[in-house]
Each structure stands twice: as C-alpha cells, then as structure tokens.
Amino acid sequence: MNFNFNNPYSTTRIPIFARNVVSTSHPLAAQAGLSMMYKGGNAVDAAIAAAAVMTIVEPVSNGLGSDSFCILWDGKELHGLNASGCAPASWTADYFKRKYGDNASAPPKRGLDSVTVPGAVSSWVALSERFGKLPFADLMAPAIDIAERGYLLPPIIQQKWAAPVDELQSLPGFAQAFLPKGRAPNVGELFQFKAAAKALRAKIGRAHV
C-alpha cells in the first residue's frame, strides 16, 4: 500500500484525548479552570473560574461589567441562563431629559448612563449556587491572585487597551483602575489589577455559596 508521508501542514498537531477540557483565549484562564477540576470541581466550577480570570487578563473584552449567557446540560435536563443586564430602574424618558436636556433622543455614548446593569458576576453566583460543587471563594481565588500579583500584557490586548484611552480617561475611576501610570500598560509590562481584585473580594463577601 502506498502512503504519502509528506505533511501538507506547516506544523504538526498531536491528538490529545481527555475527559475534561478547558478552552479559553488566554492560558492563565484555562489554567484556572483546570485547577478547579483538580480540586474536585465540575465543569461549572471550571467555567466560572476561567471566566473570572478572563476579566483580569483581557478586561478590554471581558470585563466585570459585562453580560453572561449559559446553556448547560446537567445530564437530565437542558438549562439556559440569560444574564444580559437589564436597564436601570431610573432610565426613563424624563430622567434623560432632566439630565441631558429636552432634545436628548438616546442615551450618551460613554459613562454610567450608556450601559445596562452588569449581569456577568451575578450569573457566576447563580450558576455556582445551583450547579457548582466548590465554594465560590475558591472559584474567585485564581483571578484575585493574578490580579494582585500581576500578569504580562500581550500585544493584541495592549492595542485594544491603548486605542480608546483619549476618549475614556476622563471618565470617573477609569484612569485609576486602567491607567495607574497615566498611560496604557506596554506590551510585556507587568500589570497589577488591584481594583478588580478588590471588586472580586467584595463579591465573595456577598455570595452565599
């Protein structure tokens, strides 16, 4: 039998088979998910831990103020979770007219009045309470540790970080959290996200799991 041993691809891939796989766009997040598996946690625990780390290492794409969605099969039943933030209760036509004038026809582009109530963190708590095995504090531990110790910024994240600085730096709290040196972190620079670590610790205190 003739067989062509020439590999048509520039690199070779070794097939790996496993019972548990955690896949993310950042290795530290995948590592956090796997660590929950090693602790005896399940897929929900791993997903929450990985998602929390993503808000630290890729905050320009996955922030604590984001939304969350989940489709989960528990072995018997399919569950769906929609944690897209709802509109704040005060968002009425009169509210925007009082604050931005009678000609205001839409919410502003930036600032607190431009976003819905964040749903991501509350979704983590809800999923952990109903489907998780590990304490919620354990799930947040890797993200808090990385935020406090710091991590090295990759090129793509640095580019996204630096792009909107001129537009966002005047917003309350933005510069303190994201521009501690008065600028976006450089590629390869160690960034310590202490504001996010503080926020995650506060959430642990309010969670009932």
Residue ranges and their predicted role:
Residues 1-31, 35, 43-206:
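Noncatalytic scaffold domains of N-terminal-nucleophile
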